[in-house]
């Protein structure tokens, strides 16, 4: 009986691995650390910030989760320039109007955004690097979270 329970616990993981292998040929899942928001009194990225580690495969997708459920989340990537809003000011994708999905392309970076997650699409090795998300609360305090992406 105990052996049967252990087998049933592993079944979802085995099925997921088989599905990924059959559909994609490879399967890369994973964050190794959870993202944490870091308070920044001086509006700069904190020097002691810890990044959540994510990995992806070329031509695959990766989803950064754990973003604050606010429309003022911003993406600041060290690979490019400046601050860009990821969930505002861009044309809405055709489709389900109940979900706030947006898409924007710049410097080979394509993504879909909702209010609490960001999915990078069609990954290339150029997308590897650190991604910082900045949020400002009602008291004008800045918070940052960091994601370190490795694409191989």
UniProtKB/Swiss-Prot annotation:
<feature type="glycosylation site" description="N-linked (GlcNAc...) asparagine; by host">
    <location>
        <position position="122"/>
    </location>
</feature>
<feature type="glycosylation site" description="N-linked (GlcNAc...) asparagine; by host">
    <location>
        <position position="61"/>
    </location>
</feature>
<keyword id="KW-0946">Virion</keyword>
<keyword id="KW-0732">Signal</keyword>
<keyword id="KW-0325">Glycoprotein</keyword>
<feature type="signal peptide">
    <location>
        <begin position="1"/>
        <end position="25"/>
    </location>
</feature>
<feature type="glycosylation site" description="N-linked (GlcNAc...) asparagine; by host">
    <location>
        <position position="139"/>
    </location>
</feature>
<feature type="glycosylation site" description="N-linked (GlcNAc...) asparagine; by host">
    <location>
        <position position="108"/>
    </location>
</feature>
<feature type="glycosylation site" description="N-linked (GlcNAc...) asparagine; by host">
    <location>
        <position position="148"/>
    </location>
</feature>
<dbReference type="GO" id="GO:0055036">
    <property type="term" value="C:virion membrane"/>
</dbReference>
<feature type="glycosylation site" description="N-linked (GlcNAc...) asparagine; by host">
    <location>
        <position position="69"/>
    </location>
</feature>
<dbReference type="GO" id="GO:0016020">
    <property type="term" value="C:membrane"/>
</dbReference>
<feature type="glycosylation site" description="N-linked (GlcNAc...) asparagine; by host">
    <location>
        <position position="53"/>
    </location>
</feature>
<feature type="glycosylation site" description="N-linked (GlcNAc...) asparagine; by host">
    <location>
        <position position="112"/>
    </location>
</feature>
<feature type="glycosylation site" description="N-linked (GlcNAc...) asparagine; by host">
    <location>
        <position position="48"/>
    </location>
</feature>
<keyword id="KW-0244">Early protein</keyword>
<protein>
    <recommendedName>
        <fullName>Early glycoprotein GP48</fullName>
    </recommendedName>
</protein>
<keyword id="KW-0472">Membrane</keyword>
<comment type="similarity">
    <text>Belongs to the RL11 family.</text>
</comment>
């Amino acid at each position: 009986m105990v052996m049967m329970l252990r087998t049933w616990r592993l079944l979802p993981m085995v099925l997921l691995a088989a599905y990924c292998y059959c559909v994609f040929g490879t399967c890369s899942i994973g964050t190794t650390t959870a993202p944490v928001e870091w308070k920044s009194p001086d509006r700069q990225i904190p020097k002691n910030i810890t990044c959540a580690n994510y990995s992806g495969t070329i031509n695959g997708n990766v989803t950064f989760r754990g973003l604050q459920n606010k429309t003022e989340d911003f993406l600041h990537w060290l690979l490019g320039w400046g601050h860009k809003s990821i969930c505002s000011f861009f044309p809405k994708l055709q489709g389900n109007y109940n979900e706030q999905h947006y898409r924007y392309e710049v410097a080979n970076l394509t993504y879909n955004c909702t209010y609490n997650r960001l999915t990078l699409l069609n990954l290339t090795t150029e997308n590897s690097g650190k991604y910082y998300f900045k949020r400002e609360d009602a008291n004008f305090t800045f918070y940052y979270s960091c994601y370190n992406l490795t694409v191989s």
